Amino acid sequence: MADTIKTAKAIRESGRENLRKVSISRIKKEMNDVFYLSDDLVITTLSAQNNTTAEYPASIDGFSAIIMMTGEATVSIDMQNYNVKPNTIVFFNPDSIIRTVKCSANAAPYFLAFSKSFVNEIQIDLSTSLPVYMRFGKAPVLEVAPQDVDEIRQLFQLIKTMLRSDKERYRHEIIRTLFTTAFYIITEINQREQ
């Protein structure tokens, strides 16, 4: 019995050694085509070639999401596999264990990561945000209509434009407002799906 417990503990600990903790700061340093707001918000595009979770699982220290534009992938979130295809949004809670199990060569999702402090700065009604947070903890994959993806993609493009903008005085407020808009669109989609 004692040997069985030691073996199980050794297996868990060896898995943790291979788990990479990824900060938003690290993402903005290591990815190509990155747009960011300090260490609070990062938007980038991913590809099969720069898939960093294929070899080892990772855990991101903030909230994150991908919107699959083309291609397909199988993603493991906390040891549960999900098929991701175009017009799919996948949400990752902080410290979720993420691994890409399989990925087509043409897979191209948008990736967004944002810190807990960034979320706390956004003025969203708790009665609106809590059901969404709870839903994505249980069912992180949301299939959406192409029009929904296009609206969210346009908002992300606008956020990226503002991240490059010379309008520094109100940049944070503008980006928070656009992010809040994206959140409410996703909330609307989520309520429609229930």
Predicted ranges, named:
Residues 45, 65, 89-91, 111-113, ...:
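Conserved hydrophobic/aromatic beta-strand scaffold that supports enzyme active sites
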Residues 1-73, 80-82:
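Generic protein-terminus/edge-of-domain signal
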Residues 51, 86-87, 95:
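Tight coil/turn sites that cap or link beta-strands
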Residues 79-91:
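Short acidic-glycine-tyrosine-enriched beta hairpin
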